[in-house]
Amino acid sequence: MSGDRPKRPLSAYMLWLNETREQIKKDNPGSKVTDIAKRGGELWRGLKDKTEWEQKAIKMKEEYNKAVKEYEANGGTDSGAPKKRKKAAAKPAKKAKKKESSEEEEEDESE
């Protein structure tokens, strides 16, 4: 993906979480990042009125769509499809260590 292509907009949940994360940290001191995210998910599911965040997300998506159209109109060629990566050149396998000469002699004698 080109570095100039506009970044995708955040979801309503992510907008809310970014603004609420510090308060969750204060309410749950010493929590791991995963615990904070889990608690954020619980709070989001319990949130009654999400319209503020959904409206912000809609506005950001509209701005994103406009920016993408401008990008593509100005010669942006990224279609959004991931490009196939070339496989790295195969590295030769490591050679097995040769047995020491004394071990080889012992094997020869035992036969």
Swiss-Prot record:
InterPro entries: HMG_box_dom, HMG_box_dom_sf, HMGB. Residues 6-72 bind DNA. GO terms for molecular function: DNA binding, bending. The keyword NAD does not apply. Keywords: Chromosome, DNA-binding, Nucleus, Phosphoprotein. Gene3D superfamilies: High mobility group box domain. Residues 102-111 have a biased composition (Acidic residues). CDD domains: HMG-box_SSRP1-like (cd21994). It is found in: Nucleus; Chromosome. SUPFAM superfamilies: HMG-box (SSF47095). Residues 72-111 are annotated as: Disordered. The modification Phosphoserine is found at residue 11. The keyword Plastid does not apply. One of its GO terms (biological process) is regulation of transcription by RNA polymerase II. Residues 82-98 have a biased composition (Basic residues). GO terms for cellular component: chromosome; nucleus. Belongs to the HMGB family. This is High mobility group protein Z. It comes from Drosophila melanogaster.
